Amino acid sequence: MAKVISRPYNPKSSGLQSHMGVCRHKRNKVGIGLLLQLKRRSIMKKIDIYEELKSNDYPGRGIVIGKSADGKSAVKAYFIMGRSVNSRNRVFIEDGDGIRTQAFDPSKLEDPHLIIYAPVRVLGDKTIVTNGDQTDTIYEHMENGQTFEQSLRTREFEDDDPNFTPRISGIIEPNKGGFDYSMSILKSADGNPQSCQRYTFSYNNPLDGEGHFIHTYMGDGSPLPSFEGEPKKVAIPNDINEFTDVLWNSLNADNKVSLFVRFIDI
């Protein structure tokens, strides 16, 4: 099942182009913390992703991965936002089993190296999703026997001084009768490009109706403040249309550009 919603590009406006793609895809056949002498289970509260997005005018690019509430689907979502005409002049198009970005109006394309890439690629029964061309890095390294984490050791944050935008990535990998997923962020050391901080978060056998959300920025600003902490726990519903529509409607109307959602039968 696929659905695309587009808003016509208006050259007299700020250049906002919105596009939303949705498809259903069949796969090819807590921490425990110590506090003094007391052991306590660290419980991350589940946030309302819709309220989270509504309260943040500019989360940048974001990835959601999890399991549908009925336990039948692995779910992933990816969105992009933009403030400049160049960043807003993009749509998602299908590319094999994945997607790639493309300039809506090629005549307005300025610097493609950070905005034109494949956010989603499928390698066998694994699905990769990222906010940049590290999708290809992960694909190529894993094709040659390396792991998700090993492949990302060859990359770092983006070179968009002074923001040094984090590279965020995720992967869904099947296991016996289910799946695992991982998320990664590569970021500067509080805005200092002399150090790259690499974090990987792995989730084995996710629970029904639960997922995690990671994005590039804490909000708007100059420079843009990088995401902090670990991916946020969120609820994942059963209905792809409901999930897509509410995500899209929760993103800031002036800054949202494109959204892609996929439910994978498990």
Annotate the PLM regions.
Residues 6, 13-14, 18, 42:
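Serine residues within intrinsically disordered or low-complexity segments
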